[in-house]
A protein has these predicted regions:
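C-terminal structured domain segments
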Residues: 99-128
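Outer-envelope beta-barrel architecture signal
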Residues: 3-13, 27, 39-47, 58-60, ...
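Glycine/small-residue-rich hydrophobic helix-like segments
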Residues: 75-109
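Outer-membrane beta-barrel architecture
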Residues: 1, 30-34, 63-69, 100-106, ...
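Residues that define the transmembrane beta-barrel architecture of outer-membrane proteins
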Residues: 23-29, 56-62, 95-101, 133-139
Length: 160
């Protein structure tokens, strides 16, 4: 489900049910609220819930991010995200497993259909309640191939 509350405010809800032979059945719910600030900038609130046969109760994550799209001197597009978030579970203990703050940098690479991303973040994790949180750096590298493109979409929609 998707709706525009206003010209610059968009809401999306996605519900998915899946059955995997190894993992069993599970469902996920996603809520996304985007507020456009300018043509190439937005603030996003994102929440996801996951419940399944092999999850620890309801597993959840939530984040607030600022995204800005840009175009380099070479004509290649990119985007930068700054975010903070948390994730946790409801069973066997109701706890926040991780707090995080990070950035994600995305850039069009060698071809128009090839993108790379680098995402450094700092995380404060705990595995069991009442233990001390441990801080840890995390760096994710991604390479993405864009198979289908809608040239009519704005850059704002493409950075989502």
């Amino acid at each position: 489900y998707q709706d525009a509350f206003a010209e610059d405010l968009n809401f999306r809800f996605t519900q998915r049910f899946t059955y995997d032979l190894g993992e069993g059945g599970y469902g996920s719910s996603r809520f996304v609220l985007d507020k456009a600030l300018r043509e190439r900038e937005l603030v996003r609130a994102y929440t996801r819930f996951l419940y399944g046969e092999k999850t620890e109760g309801t597993e959840w994550s939530s984040s607030l991010s600022y995204a800005r799209g840009w175009k380099g001197d070479s004509g290649r597009v990119g985007a930068t995200w700054l975010y903070l978030g948390a994730d946790g579970q409801t069973e066997p203990y109701d706890l926040v497993k991780n707090y995080k703050v990070g950035a994600r940098f995305r850039r069009q690479a060698y071809r128009d259909w090839l993108f790379w991303e680098i995402e450094p973040s700092y995380n404060w994790r705990v595995d069991e309640p009442y233990l001390d949180r441990e801080g840890a750096w995390r760096i994710e590298l991604r390479l993405e191939f864009l198979l289908f493109d809608n040239p009519g979409e704005t850059l704002e929609k493409q950075i989502r």
